[in-house]
């Protein structure tokens, strides 16, 4: 809102002296020449644009603002594209600037200016580097050692046989088989 107001005031201030001069030429008063010239100097001296520029220096007329130029090599876009500068950037987004020759043809009386174009240089931390492959070795299937498989506990039943020979068996003739005692033992195998 304020910028459009100051733009309107600036345009009015620039055109006001021409309008006043045109009206004075059309009127052609029959007064003294010295008084008329003194009156015109007063009008030109106190134009509002000078008051606005002295009062608000940040809104001064700057027709040659420095704007970064991004070159676009497009046959349908003969003019450079002006980039709006960003206010806040992270360190990863800060780009390097490189001086390149201007691709826009200059007129024969002007020197060829140089423009600035951005070229990103990514950091190594953002790049994925593939591992080197040896051509001499045969391919070994890779086993994923990081993946964890949930182990299921399977109970197993084993028969443990204890042979117990009693003292009576030693005194007798060994004709019968020794007594066999079986116990159920459960163990967890992972």
Curated annotation (Swiss-Prot):
GO biological process terms, semicolon-separated: lactation; protein stabilization
Tissue: Mammary gland specific. Secreted in milk.
Site feature (Cleavage) residues: 126-127
One annotated Gene Ontology cellular component of this protein: extracellular space
Sugar-bearing residue positions: 152, 154, 157, 163, 186
UniProt keyword Phosphoprotein, yes or no: yes
UniProt subcellular location: Secreted
Phosphothreonine found at: 166
Modified sites of kind Phosphoserine: 187
Keyword presence, Phosphoprotein: yes
Keywords: Glycoprotein, Milk protein, Phosphoprotein, Secreted, Signal
Pfam family for this entry, one: Casein_kappa
UniProt cross-references to InterPro entries, sorted A to Z: Casein_kappa
Signal peptide: 1-21
Summary of the function given for this chain in its UniProt record: Kappa-casein stabilizes micelle formation, preventing casein precipitation in milk.
Family classification: Belongs to the kappa-casein family.
Name assigned to this protein: Kappa-casein
């Amino acid at each position: 809102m304020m910028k459009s107001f100051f733009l309107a005031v600036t345009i009015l201030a620039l055109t006001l002296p021409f309008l006043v001069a045109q009206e004075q030429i059309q009127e052609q008063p029959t007064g003294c020449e010295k008084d008329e010239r003194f009156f015109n100097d007063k009008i030109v001296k106190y134009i509002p644009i000078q008051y606005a520029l002295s009062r608000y220096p940040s809104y001064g007329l700057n027709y040659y603002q420095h704007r970064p130029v991004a070159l676009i090599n497009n046959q349908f876009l003969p003019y450079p594209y002006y980039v709006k500068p960003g206010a806040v950037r992270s360190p990863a987004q800060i780009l390097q600037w490189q001086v390149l020759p201007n691709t826009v043809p200059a007129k024969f009386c002007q020197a060829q200016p140089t423009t600035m174009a951005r070229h990103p240089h990514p950091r190594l931390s953002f790049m994925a580097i593939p591992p080197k492959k040896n051509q001499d070795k045969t391919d070994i299937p890779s086993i994923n050692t990081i993946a964890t498989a949930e182990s299921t506990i399977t109970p197993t039943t084993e028969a443990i046989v204890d042979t117990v020979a009693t003292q009576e068996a030693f005194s007798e003739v060994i004709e019968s088989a020794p007594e066999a005692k079986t116990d159920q033992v459960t163990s967890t195998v992972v």
